[in-house]
Amino acid sequence: YLNRFESYLVSCADELYALVEQINHPYVEIMFDTFHANIEEVSTADAIRRIAKKTPHIQLSESTRGILGEGQVNWPSVLQAIKDVNYSGWLVVEAFSEKLPAAHIWRKMFNSERELVEKSYQFLITNYEKI
């Protein structure tokens, strides 16, 4: 789902889960994005726990759309929730760079894609192992 500033259909995990349940089709599931959840949810971790069974794809995105761990997302609780639900779907890092014109990025969030990948990966591995 998207946050309330980018969408009017649904803007939180519970609304999206209810919509997916109402559609009731095996090909309609949830793609969860921590950037939007960080705006809309009281607890991103609790939202993950509530919708996990209908969520085959989670986009891990920092509040700045930059390197994971360098913003305001509560990663320990998010990673704990992912572990708690025995999540086995896709975990994808989503970040925006100046190379994506449609994102209207006006400042650099990382120096290179390589830095983004290396630092975000190391952050995830290090912090997931702590749980």
Per-region residue spans from a language model:
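Residue-level "edge-of-site" marker
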Residues: 1-2, 95
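Surface-exposed cleft-lining segments at the edges of enzyme active sites
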Residues: 2-8
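Histidine-acidic metal/acid-base catalytic patches
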Residues: 10-32, 37-131
